[in-house]
Amino acid sequence: MEEKITYKNAGVDTEKGREFIQKIKRNVESTHGPRVIGGLGGFAGAYDVSVLKKYKHPILLSGTDGVGTKIELARLLKIYNTIGIDLVAMCVNDILVCGGEPFFFLDYIACGKLDPEKMDQIVSGIVQGCKMSNASLLGGETAEHPGTMKEDEFDLAGFVVGAVEKDSMIDGSTIRSGDKILGLESSGPHSNGFSLIRKLLLKEGKYLPTDPQQVKFLKDYALKPTRIYVSSILKLLQQVSVKGMVHITGGGYQENIPRILPQGTQSKFFKEKIPSGYFFEKIKKDHKIEELELFATFNMGIGYMVIVSEENAELAKKIMESSGEVVHEIGEIVSGNKEEVQFV
């Protein structure tokens, strides 16, 4: 008997997709507050923006990002419950740079074949990240791509929307020579530099090492989720005038810091004040990579930076430390070419 031609035979199991939605529904809806209208599964996510009435002149902020090739490391290690946190962190930390409070988050997951257990773990991480950011997981899409992705392959993208008061929006325009740079410690490489990490630490750049200690190092240090700085920074902004902020992501110091500096200013860092931590010290020790290349690739132990006037530096540091952050005064602003970064 001739086999029936169906969508399922072509590689897309819509019934399994519906079951997956039911499986994650309660978890996703645990991020919903009174602003979310309706539940999961509709054509659109609905969010009550009457909250904007508390703003004199609200500015909406949006951001989108992924987790890069850190996903490949998670796939090899079969650990899926942390990269969802990474996904949220990469987005919310970006709009936070402008002083933005996240409102809601959306996710997109593409996979070769839907594995409900694996996807449930990924979504659980996204839910955890949303709770840490006080953002609602308003909706998402999980798409099977049979024939174009291998069955165990997947990729993630995240999208966040938030708001900031226009007069409170932080754009770096008031930064001046003499201002201090405070660095908030990272948890490790966060979600950047993983193409280099895989080249250095995986066999042929794509297989797990055979040494169990090296595998443990990858699990314990490389795969640690990206820190979410939302609550600490929003608390700081209520009490201290902040001139500029930087989320250290792809391109490290050299690519990210110039993005918020006015012309005629330059960042100067004191290397001995930057707590690179075990992961980066091991990379530096075990592999012949120039230090400047490391700073141009990784966060080197500092995931987020806050620029304040000299007189506000100590107070800002204390406030962030009271929120549980580990903070270091790692540099200052000097006169010079904003595109160049000094390390002394």
From Swiss-Prot:
Pathway: Purine metabolism; IMP biosynthesis via de novo pathway; 5-amino-1-(5-phospho-D-ribosyl)imidazole from N(2)-formyl-N(1)-(5-phospho-D-ribosyl)glycinamide: step 2/2. It is an enzyme of class 6 (ligase). GO terms for biological process: 'de novo' IMP biosynthetic process; adenine biosynthetic process. Its EC number is 6.3.3.1. It comes from the Bacteria. Keywords: ATP-binding, Cytoplasm, Ligase, Nucleotide-binding, Purine biosynthesis. It catalyses: 2-formamido-N(1)-(5-O-phospho-beta-D-ribosyl)acetamidine + ATP = 5-amino-1-(5-phospho-beta-D-ribosyl)imidazole + ADP + phosphate + H(+). Gene3D superfamilies: PurM-like C-terminal domain, PurM-like, N-terminal domain. GO terms for cellular component: cytosol. GO terms for molecular function: ATP binding; phosphoribosylamine-glycine ligase activity; phosphoribosylformylglycinamidine cyclo-ligase activity. InterPro entries: PurM-like_C_dom, PurM-like_C_sf, PurM-like_N, PurM-like_N_sf, PurM_cligase. Its main location: cytoplasm. It is found in: Cytoplasm. NCBIfam families: purM. Belongs to the AIR synthase family. This is Phosphoribosylformylglycinamidine cyclo-ligase. It comes from Leptospira interrogans serogroup Icterohaemorrhagiae serovar copenhageni (strain Fiocruz L1-130). The gene is purM.
